[in-house]
Amino acid sequence: MATIAFSRLSIYFCVLLLCHGSMAQLFGPNVNPWHNPRQGGFRECRFDRLQAFEPLRRVRSEAGVTEYFDEKNEQFQCTGTFVIRRVIEPQGLLVPRYSNTPGMVYIIQGRGSMGLTFPGCPATYQQQFQQFLPEGQSQSQKFRDEHQKIHQFRQGDIVALPAGVAHWFYNEGDAPVVALYVFDLNNNANQLEPRQKEFLLAGNNNREQQMYGRSIEQHSGQNIFSGFNNELLSEALGVNALVAKRLQGQNDQRGEIIRVKNGLKLLRPAFAQQQEQAQQQEQAQAQYQVQYSEEQQPSTRCNGLDENFCTIKARLNIENPSHADTYNPRAGRITRLNSQKFPILNLVQLSATRVNLYQNAILSPFWNVNAHSLVYIVQGHARVQVVSNLGKTVFNGVLRPGQLLIIPQHYVVLKKAEHEGCQYISFKTNANSMVSHLAGKNSIFRAMPVDVIANAYRISREQARSLKNNRGEELGAFTPRYQQQTYPGFSNESENEALE
């Protein structure tokens, strides 16, 4: 009997431990920087010559332009990334769509409203309004509209776009909205082929596309309703055949960015209510733990949709100086955005770093430990060198605004701002990206014994001690100590132009 009781007790504790581990996986935060749920990475890739990219082709719509970087280039394919830049003119609406891959949007300039439609979440915005008809016609009855939350965006915002979540953007300002999109094709959320696919819910892409420096081609793409039979569609949605045809976008030549003639009439709370909502959202975010692995784990006590999921913040500003992680008043500031600050990034599995370098400031040489990096120059110019595992320079040039450089994982990079300074944003293919610095506080030299450094480089102990400590407590952005008139290692323009 004692043996049976002991066996039952052992089984009980084993089950308890297993349940505890499963619950931790389900509801614990996915903040392990060494784990990244990405596919691919096994193909042979050559990163022996990097190049600065600019948009290769553009598609014009009624109220804006979509510019595509060269997704067929080996560097984009090897890193599993897809990049576009969109310009939305005032009163322009980017029609609703969703994508097979998760992504991030960086608002380079402009402001407006956007909506992300999460499945299963309630419509928390409600309004009633009276529609007035022209004189001589009777007034229609009151209509009630309700929808999910509308977000306001502005310059410097990062917007997370989970795979399969419908979204739209609207420019309600007086200046064009310019936004950079980065998508992760190798994310496990994408179970299709490693290509970017946008599923339009409205509009179409039946517009001419222009290849920069090449001939004009025709780009064809319809919205998802166009493939259904008109009668079946009208029956399924409970609308007449004419409305069904409108849904299918027949004879609609406006493209994917359309102009709203009289502007969108959007419901939004008063300023005080917005502040209250923001506070509630921050409280919910502090308590929220993203359940990224839940889809792959069986559960009988929940349906995969946490209450806080519907209120999770999908937008965060990365240019706010008060959010800087490191700041040197003579060199610049660095702001990092990862899943610990922005929990929805656990669903997207991307992160971002915004760097503002002052005049002639230099960034501590570093490598990305657990991610590829896509660097986009926002303002100013930067001298950049990238070195491979063979000690060879694979990029050596000056990046200008609008250019993008892919830096492979573990490749060492050195950046120096020119006289007007430099601002750039880098996207990392890990929700909690890590870097390892070569100089300054928390660098690898500071972590090594003096004798190791002296013997490794055949220098004296005094020289090794100076190498180890000469940047003192500086971290990230450095003020240059040794001014030179020329930089023979750099070229005025990128030496790594696109190979056409």
UniProtKB/Swiss-Prot annotation:
Disulphide bridges: C45-C78, C121-C310
The keyword Transport appears for this protein: no
Tissue: Expressed in endosperm (at protein level).
Signal peptide boundaries: 1-24
Region (Disordered): 481-500
GO term, biological process aspect, one: seed development
Physiological role: Seed storage protein.
Protein name: Glutelin type-B 4
Superkingdom of source: Eukaryota
Amino acid composition bias (Polar residues), ranges on this chain: 481-493
Keywords in alphabetical order: Disulfide bond, Seed storage protein, Signal, Storage protein
UniProt entry tagged with the keyword Disulfide bond: yes
CDD domains with a match to the protein in the record: cupin_11S_legumin_C, cupin_11S_legumin_N
InterPro entries in alphabetical order: 11S_seedstore_CS, 11S_seedstore_pln, Cupin_1, RmlC-like_jellyroll, RmlC_Cupin_sf, Seed_Storage-Functional
Summary of subunit composition and partner proteins: Hexamer; each subunit is composed of an acidic and a basic chain derived from a single precursor and linked by a disulfide bond.
Domain Cupin type-1: 50-245, 316-465
Homology family: Belongs to the 11S seed storage protein (globulins) family.
Pfam families noted in UniProt: Cupin_1
GO MF terms held by the record: nutrient reservoir activity
